[in-house]
Amino acid sequence: MEKTLETVPLERKKREKEQFRKLFIGGLSFETTEESLRNYYEQWGKLTDCVVMRDPASKRSRGFGFVTFSSMAEVDAAMAARPHSIDGRVVEPKRAVAREESGKPGAHVTVKKLFVGGIKEDTEEHHLRDYFEEYGKIDTIEIITDRQSGKKRGFGFVTFDDHDPVDKIFLQKYHTINGHNAEVRKALSRQEMQEVQSSRSGRGGNFGFGDSRGGGGNFGPGPGSNFRGGSDGYGSGRGFGDGYNGYGGGPGGGNFGGSPGYGGGRGGYGGGGPGYGNQGGGYGGGYDNYGGGNYGSGNYNDFGNYNQQPSNYGPMKSGNFGGSRNMGGPYGGGNYGPGGSGGSGGYGGRSRY
């Protein structure tokens, strides 16, 4: 049936609702089936969908899958019960990232620290705490001010005790704090920025994912001004390869995404691919000596002020965020596996559990 202008928003709304109910499950044993995956996750609620991704030719498991619950509350309950172990193997559940969000800086990086832009002069720490504590336990809140004038510079950081609240906040695009629209992004350390930029230029390896690397200070909002360029696919041509049901892929391309570090896909958003040309620095500098790369000299005084409207973090030298990358069909392309690394698969590499 031909799609009409009326059905497109409805489909998008349905997809967004599904996105909040879907988990990516990485690190699956080759022995794990859809039945055993379903049996495990049904302890937290009713599943509306469950799939183990397989190679279309060999039918061998690629070491990851997806489960979709009937409600967000069930997803929260499952994530609160981590760690998860299926068929004798500890797996890595993460909130699935839709295709349109997958290419954003930090989309697949696991951190505990959140960058918050759009903070106005009348917004205080307690406003941030009141808003964000519903997502999880907060460790620290910092609103950045000018050292000389003491005025707020329009941004700050919220650090949680776990990465899942940050992932959940990142998925929910629109946030209003103290009556003002706010822009939220995962806060990346200089090392993480460099890893992301290295992957974009085709020099990256298979970094895996795991521990949050989010403690302490010294963070920026992620590479790429306007939060547009910069694939987070830790590794040239790697990432998720295929995908699932029309949702964005990991950095290796395809549809539904979870996290980097799963070895080689075929095509898609591979590191350094076209369409991610932004090399500009959003705020002009880093934060507490973590600037690095395109973020300037590295002192947070070079970070600039957040005076623009949300979604306009600074000048771009080039851009073109998004664009299709060999999306293929719902179950097409890519090779994944729970062991090894490199072009034909794998989970592992340097996973940071």
Swiss-Prot record:
Residues 308-347 are annotated as: Nuclear targeting sequence. GO terms for cellular component: Cajal body; catalytic step 2 spliceosome; chromatin; chromosome, telomeric region; cytoplasm; extracellular exosome; glutamatergic synapse; neuronal cell body. The modification Dimethylated arginine is found at residues 203, 213. One of its GO terms (biological process) is positive regulation of telomere maintenance via telomere lengthening. There is a cross-link at residues 22, 104, 112, 120, 137, 152, 168, 173, 186 (Glycyl lysine isopeptide (Lys-Gly) (interchain with G-Cter in SUMO2)). Gene3D superfamilies: 3.30.70.330. Keywords: Acetylation, Cytoplasm, Isopeptide bond, Methylation, mRNA processing, mRNA splicing, mRNA transport, Nucleus, Phosphoprotein, Repeat, Ribonucleoprotein, RNA-binding, Secreted, Spliceosome, Transport, Ubl conjugation. It holds the Pfam family HnRNPA1_LC. Residues 193-353 are annotated as: Disordered. Residues 202-223, 320-353 have a biased composition (Gly residues). A motif (Nuclear localization signal) lies at residues 9-15. The modification N6-acetyllysine is found at residues 168, 173. The modification Phosphothreonine is found at residues 4, 140, 159, 176. The modification Phosphoserine is found at residues 29, 85, 149, 189, 201, 212, 225, 231, 236, 259, 324, 341, 344. The modification N6,N6-dimethyllysine is found at residue 104. Its main location: nucleus. Residues 21-104, 112-191 form the RRM domain. In the brain, isoform A2 and isoform B1 are abundant in large ganglion-type neurons, such as Purkinje cells, and are less abundant in neighboring glia cells. Isoform A2 is more abundant than isoform B1 in brain. In testis, isoform A2 and isoform B1 are present in spermatogonia and spermatocytes, but not in spermatids or sperm. Isoform A2 is more abundant in the adrenal medulla than in the cortical cells. Isoform B1 is found in both adrenal medulla and cortical cells. Isoform A2 is more abundant than isoform B1 in the adrenal gland. InterPro entries: HnRNPA1/A2_C, hnRNPA2B1_RRM1, Nucleotide-bd_a/b_plait_sf, RBD_domain_sf, RRM_dom. The modification Asymmetric dimethylarginine is found at residues 203, 213, 266. The modification N-acetylmethionine is found at residue 1. This is Heterogeneous nuclear ribonucleoproteins A2/B1.
